[in-house]
Swiss-Prot record:
Reported function: Catalyzes the ADP transfer from ATP to D-glycero-beta-D-manno-heptose 1-phosphate, yielding ADP-D-glycero-beta-D-manno-heptose.
Protein name (Swiss-Prot/TrEMBL): Bifunctional protein HldE
Enzyme class: transferase
Domain of life: Bacteria
């Protein structure tokens, strides 16, 4: 399936925050130092990569967005390396240079794809310097759609409430990657994106899904946020918004090599998507996929538009087409709804697939974007149709259905009616063939109560599985 992304080239974003240089010393190690019980690494590669807020800006640029970057640097060699690193990606930095502090640098020593140690070179920036950075950046707000505050608690983002208010007054969405024990600093932000540890540092231990949602809603009301996106590692993401149902997005990471910069990737993908016109739910799905790509890389990295398209397509393949379990189908439906797709569901035995079935399923598919066919398993068919049925076992019936162009997902159920599975999945439209009354259709009341529709379609006259079986038997 072709996955549609927003027009990232239309995105205009300002990133302000703690910029830093991620420096990597890499080499083999094969012995222990005689001076101390530590490995000796023979450095044969040195690499510099923009990190922190600079990595956010690079991710936006790599996706194709237009980005301006503001941050604080020292008068040193690492500032020059950082400047060169962002310019390679087409980002022109707006630095506030200070003479008495170094450019923040994170030096990592790696061997055999493993990080052995990290050394930090940094000093805290004071409030006056932070306010000078905001003042220097204020004019840029007139030319952007989204402001990102990338806070690593190094001092660049100190008391940003007034700047957030100025941005919101200009119609600019404000996204914050927060730090610290008090989110009141970000009062009025459109969206904050704490990880689970950062979230619990503010609200206390989260004991359940309901507890997480309740605590997030309290923060939203207290600090006038529009939404909170909690990133939860292997549990994916949870989006809690004002006056909207919560949204859980499962993780899509396949192999985790390094989580360095994953938070940067999330907020950059969110910012680029929102600035390009995506809904918040769509932006979260894109950001989740981007994070899944970047943690599969070593060190601070970016995600390109092509990588994102490929990953979204692969995710769709995994969430899949064809025969599924109920759990797999529930996830596939969540992904489809994030893409704004309408889901239609029907059910039946489909013992011997015939032209009437094909026509009916084509009509059902035309009512939406995705079609689910729930199929009675063998024991259920026998109870409903009697001895000698089904003619074809359930795995073969489902395989044939899955091969039809009109059918996206096929799922078995064991009961005599699909009441339970329909109630669990709650499609946007429930379809039944024949002369049923809507009020008599299993699961129909639940679908309607959830805001969905129930429709009855006619079968093709003179074509039925029973008639086909009788015709075959009469010719013996």
């Amino acid at each position: 399936m072709k996955v549609s992304l927003p027009a990232f080239e239309n995105a205009r974003v300002l990133v302000i925050g703690d910029v830093m240089l991620d420096r990597y010393w890499v080499g083999p190690t094969g012995r222990i130092s005689p001076e101390a019980p530590v490995p000796v690494v023979k450095i044969n590669q040195i690499e510099d990569r923009p990190g922190g807020a600079a990595n956010v800006a690079l991710n936006i640029a790599t996706l194709g967005g237009h980005v301006q970057l503001a941050g604080i640097v020292g008068q040193d060699e690492t500032a020059q390396a950082l400047t060169q690193g962002v310019k390679v990606f087409g980002v022109e930095p707006q630095w506030l240079t200070v003479a008495d502090k170094p450019t923040i640098t994170k030096l990592r020593v790696l061997s055999r794809n493993q990080q052995l140690i990290r050394l930090d070179f940094e000093e805290q920036f004071d409030k006056a310097t932070s306010q000078a950075l905001f003042a220097q950046s204020e004019a840029i707000l007139d030319n952007v759609d989204v402001l990102v505050l990338s806070d690593y608690a190094k001092g660049a983002i100190d008391e940003p409430k007034d700047f957030i208010a100025k941005a919101r007054a200009k119609g600019v969405k404000v996204l914050v990657d927060p730090k610290g024990h008090d989110f009141a600093r970000y009062h009025g932000a459109s969206l904050i994106t704490p990880n689970m540890s950062e979230f619990e540092a503010v609200v206390g231990t989260v004991t359940s899904e309901d507890d997480l949602i309740e605590k997030a809603q309290k923060l939203i009301k207290l600090h006038d946020f529009e939404a909170i996106l909690v990133t939860r590692s292997e549990k994916g993401m949870t989006l809690v918004s004002q006056n909207q149902p919560e949204l859980h997005i499962p993780t899509v990471a396949r192999e985790v090599h390094d989580v360095t910069g994953a938070g940067d990737t999330v907020i950059s993908a969110l910012a680029t998507s929102i600035a390009a016109g995506a809904s918040l739910a769509q932006a979260c799905a894109i950001a989740n996929t981007a994070a899944g790509v970047v943690v599969g890389k070593l060190g601070t990295s970016t995600v390109s538009r092509i990588e994102l398209i490929q990953a979204l397509a692969l995710n769709h393949g995994e969430s899949g087409f064809g025969v599924m379990t109920e759990d797999q189908l529930a996830y596939a439906m969540d992904q489809a709804r994030l893409r704004g797709e309408r889901i239609v569901m029907t059910n039946g035995c489909f013992d011997i697939l015939h032209a009437g079935h094909v026509s009916y399923l084509q009509q059902a598919k035309a009512l939406g974007d995705r079609l689910i066919v729930a199929v009675n398993d063998d024991s259920s068919v026998t109870r409903l149709k009697g001895p000698g049925r089904p003619v074809n076992p359930v795995d073969r019936r489902m395989a044939v259905l899955a091969g039809l162009a009109s059918v996206d997902w096929v799922v078995p159920f064991t009961e005599d009616t699909p009441q339970r599975i329909i109630t669990r999945l709650l499609p946007d439209s429930l379809v039944k063939g024949g002369d049923y009354k809507v009020e008599d259709i299993a699961g129909g009341a639940e679908v309607i109560a959830a805001g969905g529709k129930v429709e009855v379609l006619g079968f093709e006259d003179g074509v039925s599985t029973t008639a086909i079986i009788q015709n075959i038997m009469s010719q013996k």
